Curated annotation (Swiss-Prot):
Pathway info: Carbohydrate metabolism; tricarboxylic acid cycle; oxaloacetate from (S)-malate (quinone route): step 1/1
One GO MF term: L-malate dehydrogenase (quinone) activity
InterPro entries referenced in this protein's UniProt entry, alphabetically: FAD/NAD-bd_sf (IPR036188), MQO (IPR006231)
One GO-annotated biological process of the protein: tricarboxylic acid cycle
EC number(s) on file: 1.1.5.4
Superkingdom of the source species: Bacteria
UniProt keyword terms in alphabetical order: FAD, Flavoprotein, Oxidoreductase, Tricarboxylic acid cycle
Cofactor: FAD
Name of the gene encoding the protein in the UniProt record: mqo
Name this protein carries in UniProt: Probable malate:quinone oxidoreductase
Record has Oxidoreductase as a keyword: yes
Amino acid sequence: MSDTAESVDVVLVGGGIMSATLGTLIKQLEPDWTIQIFERLGEVAMESSNPWNNAGTGHAALCELNYTPEKDGKIEIGSATRINEQFQLSRQFWAHLVTAGAVPEPKEFINPTPHMTFVRGKENAEYLRRRFDALRAHPLFDAMEYTEDPAVIHSWAPLLVLQRDKDEVIAATRFEGGTDVDFGALTNKLVDYLMEHGAALHLNHEVRGLSKNADGTWHLRVRNDVGRSTVEVDAKFVFIGAGGGALPLLQKSGIPEIKGFGGFPISGEWFRTDDPEIVAKHRAKVYGKAAIGSPPMSVPHLDTRVVGGETSLLFGPYAGFSPRFLKKGSLLDLFASIRPHNIIPMLAVAKDNMSLIKYLVSQLLASKETKFDALREFMPTADPKDWYQVTAGQRVQVMKKDAEKGGVLQFGTEVVAAADGSIAGLLGASPGASTAVPIMLDVLERCFPDCIAGWKKPLTRMIPNYGTLVASDPKKTPKIIRETAEVLELQH
């Protein structure tokens, strides 16, 4: 421990939705704990939490087909129900914060937006019908609708059917109670709350090194990128919620739990329109079906996004490759993350995921016209003059060692925590932000086992279904969802 270092209870590395959520949970549970946040950029929520960088918002598995795979003729809904349950916990915590006055004006970060799935062709329509039948029997999905009638689809999302071939077989599902979430706005609100209650935010501060002190605390060396000065801090607990930057920092920590992990960075692009005439004809998040053999991140979707009170449409994502782990990261990020302990898992992933590599190459080589044709498959009336391309954020998929294959590519998030609970970090991507609350609850349970029993009562007050399933009593499920919808000013 350094004599010159400031001592704090908690350091949060990264100013995104994960750090903001964990900090808010801790501040609600332990108001007297000291918290410092270090963000390398000049504002919070500028990387994956930024709404224009976030590939999917309001994830609740209502419309994403990759969460309901079909095996041996049976639709598996386990992933979908689990993710929806997790999203309900996030909603409950946000509703608590709104009720408590900690997060004002819910419409500034969450808005009612129907979630739809749209498919073309007889075979895909039959699959969608089977998926609908499987999900509708579950209490969290029983309000879902299905149709193959173009007139009904037109009433739900006109742009999907205008000027479409009348002989084409199409089908869609809709869940009217879906949402669009601006995680950038929510992050800012949570950070404001933390600062109002004593937390310190340090912008333009990059954590360059961390090491464990003899007393079990962590010593962090932080560079102020404005004055090029160095700040030293000792913390009892460190959370690394730095998006793609989490892997290198966890590696620097030297904890054995990070061994065998690597990161596979994937960039993305969108077509975006702000034209009010076009935007007015589409109020939904509409997900399609990925081409056979394509990875989950290739699922096309036409999204309504509400940012700063203004509504736009996004279509994509079109994947690409960049070795950066952050949108404003270094071209050396991927190569600098290679270690003797993760080189074999990384090579195994490359060998077993040639279809992903082929897909990324095809996306990189695709012309703007070819990419726009994919939008026209969704929206036949799309005109290039109304749309412009934007670059999305970086997604760093988890690569981890595997006893059988040597290494596997994991689509999802993973908490990596030291055995003593003194440090933890979050790796991975989707469903990400939408499940921030249950992910951070997992961090609390793993890192503060001696405190969790005493926290259970306040956690249950904030999140009524903490430790239980919203769908465990189907008769109560609608009431639970209705209560959060009313507080968050959502339709239900």
